Amino acid sequence: MKPTEPIQFDNEPQSNEVRAEILALEPYAIRTFTPSQCVISYSSGSYHYTPEGRKLADFTSGVLVANLGHNPVSWWNRVQTYLGLNALNDGGEYAKCVPLTAYNAITEIEATANQRLITSLQSAPGGSRINQIMWSASGSEAVQKALWAAMKRTPGKDMIIATRGGFHGKKGLAGAVTGSEQDKERDERVRFVSFPKAECIDIESRKQPLDLTSYQAELDALWEECGDRLCCIITEPYLGGGGSLHPQKEYLQLLQQFCRDHDLLFILDEIQANFGRTGPMYAFTHYEVEPDIVLLGKGLANGVPASAAVGRRDVFECLDYGEASDTWSANPLSSAAVIATLDEFEQNDVIAKGLELSRVIEAGLVRLKETQLIANVRGEGCVWGIECADFGDKPSNDVANDIIRACYQGNTDGQAIHLLGALAGNVIRISPPLTMNVEECQHYLDVMYDICQSLAQ
């Protein structure tokens, strides 16, 4: 959607001014449309605050990034310590601390981040194949680097199987393995396999046994067509951008077994799913698979731009020296943030907090079905999707936008919720920080229920 006028709300003069300035000076292309377009002055824990002083519960975690919550003091203290920023108080024009960029050099903090992340991955069930890292600053870059390595592993094997309806990015090969064969400007080296959308449309349907026959047949047909050129399968633990669709674990296990049978690489893009988001530390544990390459990002550094392709040494070493380098990979700031995030998970039992929160979220979202505005609920851990229903003469897409807008405006007591723009048109993602207080989360789920009830009147 491309608004011709800035989004405006009553009683938000400062926010409205910022919205108008953004619309005038930045292109539409840099942001996803959200009917609320929340203006944030500062954030703390599980809440955002607007220039007018309004408080909003953050049910987005900044698109699955702030798994620890926004600006945890202990995390920031760790980041500052790792960077040596205490030297800022020593006086002088320049501080003696770790540089923010170290291109064409290496740092001790980078080495520490490497060791800590590899140790964490290898200690997780399913992480035994992982022994090298390629760092990046964004998810798309991590995807691209992993695919470069896979395509160079065996000369002549440069074709990729991706999941139809998946999302891996908008750039280069990451964009090529996103979507389906119907998209424009499709890379001919990419083929797609179906995803069991109907079978996991709701948490109840996901409990049913999954018939793998048709998916196996698709894979066999692709092997027959282009097996001599195939190098890998790339998929997600769950389809995030495709509508928060969480498959039965047998589906991912089928893809992995196909790779094992044909000596293909199994690449799991869990950039939206890692660091506790689906329950355990890594989604591959949750789905009981053992990928050759795993893609990490978002919650990896709790807000500092960082991503990584982690996987087999024999695969990554197919790339030439410097072939996957870029200005910001493994920069000291992101390295410090990754180490600090690992510290927080290891010392504060964040996983247990997320699992407790998950039960509250599931019950609260299932209750929303009573309003008749919600048709399906699906998810796991602290990442959920509620699929809106057609209601009266309103299509489900409009219902979703109405809910997002009404939650932003809040109830009569001013209690409000920040939500992302709808996925796949009519699916609202619910993904608060794993550290959100359980009672507070329950309260805002109740607020959301009351708002939906009012919209349904």
Language-model features: locations:
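Conserved N-terminal phosphate-binding loop of PLP-dependent enzymes in the Aspartate aminotransferase
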Residues: K2-Q457
